[in-house]
């Protein structure tokens, strides 16, 4: 384990990176009622994430001996977000349009006690609710990267071998994390 040479990492949380794109209908900025603003749709989704999903994730803890302690819970990080037109560096402000697209990249770390399909489904459920609230909104979810969580039992032969050699070389017992 790179944190300390006397530590044996027994596992890691799973990873699900995904791009969520909310789509609406483009319109002129002076008449936003003729469009469907994807940024507002994403804001609705993010409000559901903050008020409903984040508190649930904070309650989920793994039996794995993770360091630091915060790594023992399921987490969701919002890596990046972009909506509307890009601002033109040399030409001033972007065109006055109702954004028809807003993209978010999320990073969900999940526990060995969780199920891959349930992890994805809880995000989809919030997106479905966002979509149902505003006519003309839709969404796409594109998986970017994913890894299953792993956990090796502390009494596994490989762990016992590492424990033995750490103690022999460093003259101190190994710590399991």
Can you annotate each of these PLM segments?
Residues 1-53, 70-72, 170:
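Fold-level recognition of mixed alpha/beta catalytic cores in primary-metabolism enzymes, strongest
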Residues 6-10, 89-96:
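Short beta-strand/turn micro-motifs at beta-sheet edges
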Residues 22, 108-109:
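Hydrophobic beta-strand positions in extracellular immunoglobulin-like domains
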Residues 38, 57-88, 138-177:
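An extended, acidic, His-containing surface patch that forms the Zn2+-binding/catalytic region
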